[in-house]
């Protein structure tokens, strides 16, 4: 019986992979059975159950995508021996999910009740549409997809049917994809970078935005083949691994060899601990300025009125180490509004000409009507009613804008954060505040191809539950409107 169960599980997962088109831009595989076991999310009868703390978070954030998805998954009767697959197809749907269910009729009843809509037979499959979301059930497999743009029900149903009936070449035929998805982790993801190149090329809005920020084309135009990410829950948190897949002599690796500098955590001496997010990349400014994308970005800034005295070109040339940014949500700021001008922010860069850069910035501020006021050894200015602290510490030029006085410690005194950035030329750190306590995520690349990271929490509790509670609080959405298709 155990052997039969193993073969059955393997068979259904193979079938699901055969439904995912080979030209998908990305695929995520979730080991449902492992996540349920580690999260203790099943009762004695094997039914999916959630602890009260998770239910409370989902209730308070019921419009968040993960909350909605988990509410549905708990009720529809998923096959817990099968994986869940999410993928980004090339056409029609912007993203999609494949889920094996125990009883298709029961699953349909749950979806109809939750959506207020009714299934109908279109293109010989059971189809239900709720706003921009399509549900298709065929032979105990549930397809959920969000339309890329508003389309006729018949086209949506026919496209989903093509996936479910394995009408296309699939990822199952590509060993480079399945090798990554089959690693023994709770979550595996494979991102086809070249597929995103095509998506950007076919999107007028993305193309226009890249013209405004040419530095981003360093990544969007790279010849990386793929990026893989792997996550595994452990007793006290979760571990991550990431890999860049590319040819040894690819232009992207040559670019990194020329522009990356040695990892250095000294910038943390000027990043206040009130910052919730930190990103750092160590670069050689002289080589960086030789790139067309960087020159174009610097020229855009240099052509702004009154900025010639700052000499951005020499600023970039002088960088020899980390460029870092820290962010935290200001009072009254919606975290989903990234462009909000009231975020607290800290910018730092290691420079061979730090003192001269500070002098130029002070002179520029004076020209703009900002007097030079010194407080605790830092230059203090005001921007939109918020204090801005600026200075040079150990060759690190920094500017810190806060909605409060700078009376706090800095991240350099935190060993776990310091160890991450001292070993990784490219690093990321996040601090997430919850009612139970704070949770942390740090991640970095120590070389051109291999990255790793950890998720951990300061409060006791199951890390799977903690992680799900955080996801359930992200990106609350209003009811779908036609504008959300575009």
What are these regions (language model features)?
Residues 12-59:
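N-terminal mature-domain "stem" immediately C-terminal to a signal peptide or N-terminal signal-anchor/transmembrane
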Residues 27-28, 70-177, 321-426, 443, ...:
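Single conserved position on a long alpha-helix in the C-terminal lobe of the eukaryotic protein kinase
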Residues 23-35, 86, 276-281, 323:
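A short, Trp-centered hydrophobic/proline-enriched beta-strand micro-motif
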Residues 11-12, 147, 154-281, 422-486:
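Leucine-rich, highly hydrophobic segment in Treponema pallidum outer-membrane-associated proteins
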Residues 39-82, 102, 296-323, 363-366:
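Surface-exposed, low-hydrophobicity interaction/linker segments
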Residues 5-8:
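C-terminal motif of bacterial Sec signal peptides marking the signal peptidase cleavage site
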């Amino acid at each position: 019986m155990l052997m039969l169960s193993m073969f059955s599980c393997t068979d259904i997962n193979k079938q699901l992979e055969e439904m995912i088109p080979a030209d998908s831009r990305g695929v995520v595989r979730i080991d449902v059975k492992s996540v349920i076991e580690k999260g203790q999310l099943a009762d004695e009868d094997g039914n999916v159950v959630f602890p009260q703390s998770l239910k409370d978070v989902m209730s308070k954030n019921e419009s968040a995508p993960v909350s909605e998805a988990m509410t549905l998954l708990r009720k529809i009767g998923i096959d817990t021996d099968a994986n869940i697959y999410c993928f980004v197809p090339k056409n029609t749907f912007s993203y999609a999910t494949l889920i094996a269910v125990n009883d298709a009729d029961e699953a349909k009843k749950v979806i109809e009740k939750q959506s207020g809509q009714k299934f109908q037979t279109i293109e010989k499959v059971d189809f239900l549409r709720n706003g921009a979301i399509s549900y298709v059930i065929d032979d105990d497999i549930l397809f959920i997809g969000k339309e890329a743009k508003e389309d006729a029900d018949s086209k949506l149903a026919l496209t989903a049917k093509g996936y479910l009936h394995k009408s296309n070449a699939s990822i199952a035929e590509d060993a480079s994809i399945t090798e990554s998805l089959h690693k023994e982790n709770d979550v595996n993801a494979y991102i086809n970078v070249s597929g995103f190149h095509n998506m950007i090329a076919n999107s007028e809005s993305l193309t226009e935005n890249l013209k405004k920020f040419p530095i981003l084309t360093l990544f969007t135009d790279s010849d990386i083949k793929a990026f893989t990410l792997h996550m595994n829950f452990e007793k006290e948190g979760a571990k991550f691994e990431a890999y860049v897949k590319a040819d040894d002599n690819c232009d992207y690796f040559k670019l990194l060899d020329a522009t990356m500098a040695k990892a250095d955590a000294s910038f943390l001496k000027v990043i206040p601990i009130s910052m919730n997010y930190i990103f750092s990349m160590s670069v050689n400014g002289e080589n960086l300025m030789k790139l067309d994308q960087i020159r174009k970005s610097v020229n855009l800034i240099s052509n702004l009125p009154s900025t010639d005295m700052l000499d951005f070109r020499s600023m970039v040339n002088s960088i020899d180490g980390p460029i870092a940014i820290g962010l935290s949500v200001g009072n009254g700021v919606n975290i989903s509004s990234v462009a909000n001008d009231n975020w607290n922010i800290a910018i730092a860069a290691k420079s061979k000409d730090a003192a001269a850069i500070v002098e130029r910035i002070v002179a520029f501020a004076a020209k703009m009507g900002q007097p030079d006021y010194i407080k605790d050894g830092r230059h203090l200015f005001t921007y939109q009613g918020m204090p801005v602290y600026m200075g040079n510490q150990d060759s690190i030029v920094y500017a810190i804008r806060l909605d409060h006085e700078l009376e706090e410690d800095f991240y350099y005194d935190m060993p776990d954060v310091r160890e991450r950035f001292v070993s990784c030329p490219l690093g990321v750190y996040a601090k997430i505040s919850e009612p139970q306590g704070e949770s942390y995520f740090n991640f970095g690349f120590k070389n051109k191809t291999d990255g790793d990271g950890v998720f951990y929490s300061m409060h006791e509790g199951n890390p799977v539950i903690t992680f799900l509670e955080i996801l359930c609080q992200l990106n609350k959405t209003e009811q779908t409107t036609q504008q959300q298709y575009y």
